[in-house]
Regions:
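Well-ordered, non-membrane alpha-helical segments in soluble/globular domains
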Residues: 1-5
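Membrane-embedded transmembrane helical bundles of large multi-pass transporters/channels
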Residues: 7, 11-187
Length: 187
């Protein structure tokens, strides 16, 4: 905005200008973080997908498992957009946390389901939820409580970081527990 204004006002003069200050530095830092976050997440999704292909030896299973973090990250960014929460130094890291946790939960559930299907395809989904599902849920709730501690801060970005991270962990666990058994058990 300022750059456009000055360009229009000073276009017929010999005056050169340079916009500087902490605001410009902070804006450039956020732009750099945002750009590198997109590149990094793209690389991470491809690398994880390739590892899942090796682990499960099934394109469909790898696709379902990698789909969970995509949904979780999408839901977090949608929530941020709905509530006009800006991307800043704190909130930009939530996508990485979400990907890490949701891949972990998804692998646990998918692997257990695969093992249970070898024993009995009729009870595989139920047995998966009762065994690994409980562990994933308890772990997720523990981590959610840990992140909710940030909501007691006096610093708004820290509060948002805690709340969004907690939501991210909850969504990751919930999506893994609900979608993976129902999708993979029908195949």
């Amino acid at each position: 905005f300022i750059d456009n204004y000055l360009t229009n006002k000073l276009s017929n003069t010999n005056i050169d200008y340079q916009i500087s200050g902490l605001g410009v530095l902070y804006n450039n830092l956020l732009q750099s973080l945002f750009s590198s976050q997109i590149k990094t997440l793209s690389f991470v999704f491809i690398a994880i997908f390739l590892m899942l292909l090796v682990l499960f030896r099934s394109f469909f299973t790898a696709l379902v498992v990698i789909f969970i973090p995509c949904i979780a990250v999408g839901m977090i960014f949608t929530t941020m957009s709905m509530f006009s929460i800006p991307l800043d130094i704190m909130t930009i890291t939530i996508a990485s946390i979400s990907v890490g946790m949701s891949v972990d939960y998804a692998i646990h559930i998918a692997w257990r389901l695969k093992e249970e299907q070898k024993k009995s395809s009729e009870s595989a989904e139920k047995n998966t939820i009762y065994s690994s599902g409980q562990a994933v849920l308890i772990t997720a709730l523990t981590i959610v409580i840990g992140f909710l501690v940030f909501s007691f801060s006096n610093f708004n970005p820290t509060i948002l970081f805690g709340l969004l991270s907690a939501l991210s962990i909850y969504l990751s666990a919930e999506l893994s527990l609900r979608l993976i058994p129902s999708i993979l058990n029908t195949k």
